[in-house]
Every structure is written in structure tokens, then in C-alpha cells.
Amino acid sequence: MKNYILFLIIGLLVVNTSCDSWLEETQFDKINSSTLYESEEGLEIGLNGLYGLSRRFFRFNDSDARGAYWFYCATDLAMVRTWNEAEMYRSNMRANAMPAEMWNRPYQMIDRASAIIDAAPGISMQTETRERIVLEARVIRAWAYLRLISTYDNILLDSIPTTPDNAFDEVEYKPASQKDVYAFIDRDLDYAIKHLQYKVDPGIIGLGLARQLRAESAMWQEDYTTAAAQADAIITGGHHKLVGISEIFGNNVNHSESLMAWQFDEVSGGSHTLAGGDGHVLGACFQARFYEITIPGDPVAPIIEEANYGGNAYGWTYPNEYLRSLYDKDKDKRLQFYFYPDTLYGNNPASAYYEKKLPGDPPYSTQLRQYTWSLMKYRDLSKPAKRALSYKPFIAYRLADTYILGAEAHWRKGNTEKALEYLNAIRLRAGLEEATTIDLQAIMDEYARELCFEGKRWFFLKRIGKLVEQVNKYHRFGSTTSSIQGTTMKDYMVRWPIPQAQIDAMGTFPQNPQY
């Protein structure tokens, strides 16, 4: 990747610290950076640093990570109130304004993964340990490439790690063919699938995640046979199982349904360079500030910042009425466990409405910041109520992803019986009756009901060719109940602009069309 990303990786060797396991802190300065890829200890630290870098890419807790958050908000299911609304199909969706880390950080991940993979064969260590390190690095590299190509379409492909010897070599920068990119992704994942195990510690890459990513790659390539086979293998593998609907986003998300969950720990954390990481604010982003509601005649707020109502919140983006319309309000259990209730009860002992239903019917305020339908998937009952930052692990992929992808893959292959079996596994858990027919709309709707605001629907809609249509129909902006409006997404916006600084640095690499 040479000099065009040299400035992206300068400093990684001196700031990335992580852990021998996710909850055991290891300071990077215990080993000299010059020997990072020359010993078993150095390779382990390099892998832990790679995990930390990857976690930082997928988590959201500051403006530097707003790109990851963007994908939660820019779909047909969202109503955006503030903060990053100008970047969504509006004035700031341009090459010098969009979050550059969505391009920069995956290439950092790729470069460091390649360094680990290349160095491992020359290091004296147990074969089993070497193999484990390489397998995990190859999955992370494939994951990074999969996110890059699904975001930008036109990307660079380079597996040679940057070193002081090659950093300033002359390179011709040109987009790789999508066929070559997917072939590279698949080689990494196919190798990993042959050797990984399903049972791994929380936050560590296992066979379930590798197969899920391989299935996604196959779906992008319209290879539905491979996608279906990978989904089948996860579902029948015996390790990953659907859990009760109340457990999915409960206090412990490291359960059998989780294929991969990013781990955080406040005791060993406080910075993205430490084992416990620097937390995230996903819960605060999707939840209204109920504690700002006022009731005429009551001198105090009826609701105070408290764990059951999510505590401190930002109230930036919410589920919209289109998403609500997809649920059976009388039967679907997900309304109870994925969202805060519409009807609120006072929890302030000083209020006249303590432990009583707030007067009138929802909405309790015309200000969406104070009250609107809110997501509960990322609620953290253990964090201080007056703090938005959470150290609760959050799920990157879960078995429900696999069931819905498998349903689509089998449906596209013409295997309606298996497609319905997989779709109905999700429906039955939610308390719904079995579906007897299946089509693309049924898959889209179940995906929305089950996987809303888990960060992947934008890519799903893009892949099936429905993104622009769905966003233009249903995506909403607004700050009050009377100011809610739609948006206009243009066809070229299905791919992000490449950061202008990168275009300038590479010189010969073309910008994506119409940016």
C-alpha cells in the first residue's frame, strides 16, 4: 500500500496496545517496536493491536468514528434529528466532507494484518499458535476488504505490508476489478474456514464469523449456492443457537446467538489503545431524552436519568414510522424487547407522577429530542445513569443474520421450503405465525423487523438494488413532530466518495462518479 497510506500507519507501531485476551491489559512498551514482527510475543501483541484497531473502526463514540454510525442512520428505517444529517444525501456528502476513516482505517487494518500474515512463517513458535494468529488476521483482512468494496465499489487491492524499505516505492494507483477483490476475500476466508473452530472466547474470531462473512461475499457475487451452504453450516454446526428474545440484547450479549461481539471493559479501558477500549455511545444515540419531558403543573421533571430508561441520552436518530408499521403491534414480541415503550411512567420521587402513567397520550412532547419512539437494543443497565458512554459489549453479527441471509439465498436458489424454514425460525421466536409464502419483500420486511439498527441494512439494500428506492420513500429528517420530512437520494450515492486527501495523494486514482 506504499506511500499513499504511509501517513495512515505512521504511529500505529507506537500507539496500538491491546491485550493477550480482551480483558487482560498488556502495555505495548513491554516489547520494542523494532521486534514486533520478529518474535512470538511481538506477533501476539501485533494481533491484539489489530483487534483493537478493528474494534475502533466498528464502534462509535466520537466524531472520528461518525462514519460507522452513518450506516445505522442512513437507511429507510431511520428518522434523523441532528448531528450528522448534512452527510446523509445532503450538502456534506462530498469527497472533502465525508468521514475519511471509512477508507483510511480498513486500509490500516489490511496493512497490519498483512504484516502479521507475512511475518508469521519466519518466527520460531508452536505451529498451533502461529496458525491461530494467521487465521484471525486473515479474517480481519477479508472483513476490511468486504467493508471497503461494499462502501466504495472502486478500491485498491494490495496485500504487501508497508515497511521502511518499500514505503516510498513508486506505485501505479488504479481500481482493482471487483472480481479480483472478491477472489482475494474468498481466499482468506476459505483458508480460515478450513481451520477455525466455532468455540472461541468472547470477542475472538471464530468459524461462525468466518462463514458468515464468506456467505455475505457470495451474496454480493450472486453465488447463492455457496451462500446457502455457509449459512446451513453455521445453523447446523451445533454451537450457535438462537436464544430467547429477552436475552438477545440483555445484560450479557456473549451468548450462543452471537457470532462476534466487540468487547469493552471499563476497568482495563479508558482509551482505544488499552485492552478495555474506550466504550461506545450507541445506546445514547438512538434514545430520546425522556428526562427533559415537562408536565404542566408539575414543578419537577417526572422522569430522571435512570438505567431502565437508558440514562443520559443524545437523541440523534430514531426508528421511524415506516419501521413501526412493519410490526404486528398485538403479537410481535420484538416491540417489547427492541424498543422503549410508548407509554412512560414517572420515576422521579419528587414528581406528582412518580410510578404513575404520564398524563395524556403519547407523544408527550412535540420536541423529538425529548420524546419519540426509541431503540432499546443498546441499553446498558450497568453504566452510570448520568453518563452516555457505555462499556457494554455489542454484537457485530448474530445467528439471526445467518437465518435471514440463508432464507434469501435458498429462496434465490428456488428452495422455498428451506427459505421458509429459516425465515419462520425468526418469526416464531418473535411470537408470529409461520409465513406460508416468501418473496423479496417478505425478506426485506423481516430483515427490518429483526435486524434494524444493527449497522448492516444499508449494505443489504444496496446489494439487492433497493437502497435508493427505499431511502427516498421512507428515510426521514426532523426535530419536531411538525417538521418531519423526507430526503432525496440520488443513484450515485450508493457508493461513497473516496476521501479527497487520498485522491490527491494517489494522483492517478479516479474519484467515484459525480463526486
Segments the model singles out, each with a brief description of its role:
Residues 40, 51, 106-107, 166, ...:
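Long, intrinsically disordered, low-complexity segments
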Residues 321-398:
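Flexible, polar/acidic helix-loop-strand segments at domain edges
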Residues 20-78, 190-193, 208-355:
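An aromatic- and glycine-enriched ligand-binding surface/loop that stacks and positions planar moieties
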Residues 40-58, 80-152, 175-180, 189-202, ...:
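Conserved, well-structured interaction surfaces
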Residues 16-18:
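C-terminal motif of bacterial Sec signal peptides marking the signal peptidase cleavage site
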